[in-house]
Amino acid sequence: MSTTNELVNRIDETYEISNIVKEIEIDKIALSDLELLATGGYSPLTGFLGKRDYDSVVETLRLANGSVWSIPITLPVTEEVAEKLQAGEEVKLVNAGNVYGVIQIEDIFVPDKEKEALLVYKTTDEAHPGVKKLYERPNVYVGGAIILTKRFGNNPFPSYHLDPIETREEFKKRGWKTVVGFQTRNPVHRAHEYIQKSALEIVDGLFLNPLVGETKSDDIPADVRMESYEVLLQNYYPKDRVFLGVFPAAMRYAGPREAIFHALVRKNFGCTHFIVGRDHAGVGDYYGTYEAQEIFTNFTVEELGITPLFFEHSFYCTKCEAMASTKTCPHGKEDRVILSGTKVREMLRNGEIPPSTFSRKEVVEVLIKGLKKEVVTE
């Protein structure tokens, strides 16, 4: 495994698979992980974690060689499938009848899922979407290096779906020496816009990198969100300072640990800085408001390879008549309009139109149209 910021490349569409007999049916999460492992999005990982690295990541947020890595990237299989596999063999990775890759099996092991839940998600509560998914997936893990033998054909956002090598190239083309990454699974409301633009004041470019893999069922669908990002960037951001590209991973909802993971992945995509806001990658009340920022104190910027930028909760202040945070505004709670993606979602679902202090009107229009479409298809 490479520890420098070299990109791993495990794509080989000419790899000979015709004589490989065994196969593993992989789920959507493993499929998106397979792609990100192969394209270098998860560098320095070269495959699904073996037991030694898995234990190390779960317990110490580092790989066995000491490199920082906070989320276990695993390939779960059923006991029935595991019985037919052995270390040292190559097995095809299949989803919906298509062979997408190969795993070179290094080891097969049974994880302690309760321990994984407790240490990675800080809870064993099955109401937590990450924990629920962890328990739903099969109980045996297969570790080993992978090879991606087929690129995905039915990509919903082809013009925004770029590999790390391509985003790095784009940033270079634009002459950006410093790039700040922003992770989101929500439409961008005014608080996000304020944070992004504050960060943009100190770097050359903003990489808006929405997650479009598997999310909770009540999250706003990716196609609606993408349209909302397009109208926002078109109307309110300087075109030569912002770049939109999707992050095809599944959402883990692992709060602090996922914040580290999101930063490491954005480094691979070419970012030098990464925005960490309040309750980054959180869900419900499982994590403290700024826990995802505090976790970064356990690591140096050198070992992360990317500089985190921390932002406090921002709001619209009716007295300042502007977006602000507690760092910049002296007024009391009664003057603050607190904005959140959850609140915007709630208002839209109840047929209310969020005020312009919450969200840009162009964004609201896209969301209302998208939700109407959703209701019709349900």
Curated annotation (Swiss-Prot):
Organism from which the protein derives: Bacillus mycoides (strain KBAB4) (Bacillus weihenstephanensis)
Top-rank lineage group of the source organism: Bacteria
Biological process annotations from GO: hydrogen sulfide biosynthetic process; sulfate assimilation
Family: Belongs to the sulfate adenylyltransferase family.
CDD domains: ATPS
Protein name, per record: Sulfate adenylyltransferase
Pfam families: ATP-sulfurylase, PUA_2
Entry's EC annotation: 2.7.7.4
Keyword tRNA-binding belongs to the record: no
UniProt KW Transferase keyword: yes
GO molecular function: ATP binding; sulfate adenylyltransferase (ATP) activity
SUPFAM superfamilies, sorted: Nucleotidylyl transferase, PUA domain-like
Catalytic activity: sulfate + ATP + H(+) = adenosine 5'-phosphosulfate + diphosphate
Pathway recorded for this protein: Sulfur metabolism; hydrogen sulfide biosynthesis; sulfite from sulfate: step 1/3
Keywords: ATP-binding, Nucleotide-binding, Nucleotidyltransferase, Transferase
